[in-house]
Amino acid sequence: MTDAERASAALVVRAGLVEHGLEFDEPRPGVFTAALPGERKLQTACSLRVGEHSLAISAFVARNPDENREAVYRWLLERNLRLYAVAFAVDHNGDIYLDGRIPLSAVTPDEIDRLLGSVLTYADESFNTILELGFASSIRKEWEWRLARGESTGNLEAFRGWLERSP
């Protein structure tokens, strides 16, 4: 692709981020970082990089699970079968990401909308399941510690059902 085609793709990405009201940085031309707001996962850190032939997107979803990694990874792989444009991946530390690429020729305002929407939806919808599968012991300890001290359990409410069942 030419410099003009890469610049055009970067312009479309920039306009899409602005259109969605997202605060973003552009540390280098064609490299964007933004935080996508969610409900279950309050923010998803996301980067978009205009490359030689494609637009790459990568979003941090969760750190390396403390336990039950095989079940977490199996769930992610099964989930990948239903995802659009991105897939779950793990880095060398075991941290979980959504990662994808589209050809520069496919970079349009509608496709940027779909891409950002996919990342936001998949990160948000998957977050609690990843936590339940990969961090259950830590969540249970935190829950019990807060209850014993009369502390708020507000940010653990999504897990109340299985936390209140016997261990």
Question: What is the role of each PLM region?
Answer:
Residues 61-65, 102-111:
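A generic structural motif
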Residues 58-99:
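Short, internal acidic amphipathic alpha-helical interface segments
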Residues 105-145:
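A contiguous, mid-protein "functional segment" used to position or interact
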Residues 5-12, 68-72, 111, 115, ...:
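Short amphipathic alpha-helical segments
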Residues 131-167:
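Short, highly charged C-terminal tails/helix-capping segments
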Residues 1-67:
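N-terminal catalytic cores of peptidoglycan-degrading enzymes
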Residues 16, 20, 75, 79-83, ...:
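Conserved short hydrophobic interaction patches
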Residues 33, 88-101, 140-145:
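A short beta-strand-loop-alpha-helix capping motif that often carries His-Thr
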